Amino acid sequence: VDCIITDPPYFLGMTHNGQKGSFKDLSICKPFYRDLFQEFNRVKKPGACVYFFTDWRGYAFYYPLFDLYLGASNMLVWNKQSGPGNHYAFIHELILFHCGKGVSIGATNIIDNIRSFASGAKLVEGEKVHPTQKPVALIRKLIEDSTKPGDLILDTFGGSGTTAVASIESGRNFVLMEQDEIYYFTAQKRIKDAYERFNGGG
């Protein structure tokens, strides 16, 4: 694949071998993410970029594994412009970034590591699409910064299909994975609608 953009679940409330998951014990997920990053390294092209979303709670866990198996090139900051929190609202998320050697991002423009886009969670036909949905404009910007039309984008935690929609809008191909049935069908509808808008239903 030419680029990987993904936003993993936070695993709040999950159980693993009888243990309850939280940000304090993400170590129970370490084998999963070790295997995931190794697979990223296997399926991506040598010059491909990887964008991996997290927040301040997950960063300390994810970064060492990401750097070990992929090699961290930078950390991007997404300014959401608003957010929850009682002890100073956190209005940003972090994006671990890997890019192959010799690859320039936005070679014709000066690009900093701050991205400001309003939060992507919204109502569609009266229902919330996804609680951590990213704005299409943000994902499209990452895609267009690091790929060219016709390239293949992978998202292993597809959610409601934002990466797929952004790929369609920017003329890229995509592979999307999502195990939650509700989000799967939501993504399916959004993808169909995006094709009808941008490709005449192709």
Enumerate the language-model features and the residues they cover.
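Core catalytic lobe of class I
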Residues: 1-185
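S-adenosyl-L-methionine
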Residues: 188-202
